[in-house]
Amino acid sequence: MAEDLEISKGSKEEQYENLLPQIEGLLTGENNQIANLANVTAALKEQFNFFWVGFYLVDTENELVLAPFQGPIACTRIRKGRGVCGTAWQQEKTLIVPDVEKFPGHIACSSLSKSEIVLPLYKQGNIIGVLDVDSDKLNSFDEIDEKYLTQILKLLDN
């Protein structure tokens, strides 16, 4: 349960290692996608204090729509190929952006966002959305985030 989330200190990798089984426990036995997406965003926000963490889900063949998130209000819709989220969706790959100001076509939902990682979310082999994580610091994301966030997203593919 959310109130039982154990926040850990230590290296980024140690924090993910501690969080991963807790997220798995939150998701076990719950089939409602919205509930699971909401709990994942809350757990990530609580553990890492990211500026913004949330999901965008495929709404039409060319547009993502905002889904559960934690953080300031956000862009509601993002077109395929636009910004970091739309590009990650179009390319079906993880994008790590050390400085969002240098990303061509970046959509500034908040001027406080400085770096970002976006990962595709799959269900039964089909991309159904993206996980978007923003930091208010430059160069916040790396291959450790990609590795563990990918593992978390695999838990949602049920």
From Swiss-Prot:
GO molecular function, one term: L-methionine-(R)-S-oxide reductase activity
Coiled coil: none
Signal peptide (from-to): none
Protein name: GAF domain-containing protein A
Domain GAF, residue spans: 32-158
Cellular component annotations (GO), alphabetically ordered: cytosol
Family per record: Belongs to the free Met sulfoxide reductase family.
Gene expressing this chain: gafA
